[in-house]
Amino acid sequence: MTVTIVETRALARAITGGVDTHADVHVAAALDPLGGLLGVQEFPAIPAGYARLLEWLGGFGTVCLVGIEGTGSYGAGLARHIAAAGIRVVEVDRS
């Protein structure tokens, strides 16, 4: 029983982020381990905005993975910033 509680607590801290990228702003969503929406926030598409976005996601728990649209275009800088922080980045198809 104790192991189940410990695993549940660890799981509750695992956060997944998703980012819809645009030229001027990126819209981020934070999801719990079951896909429940924890929050949505808009950030400027500049290095200071990337840092704020990652800090915001981290406020929900340990960020394990971030799915980003357009890692080769509008999301390229953000993808590099998040990868440099040691967080796995996954390309999300725009369709």
Give residue spans per PLM region.
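Phosphate- and other anionic-substrate recognition elements at nucleic-acid/protein interfaces
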Residues: M1-S95
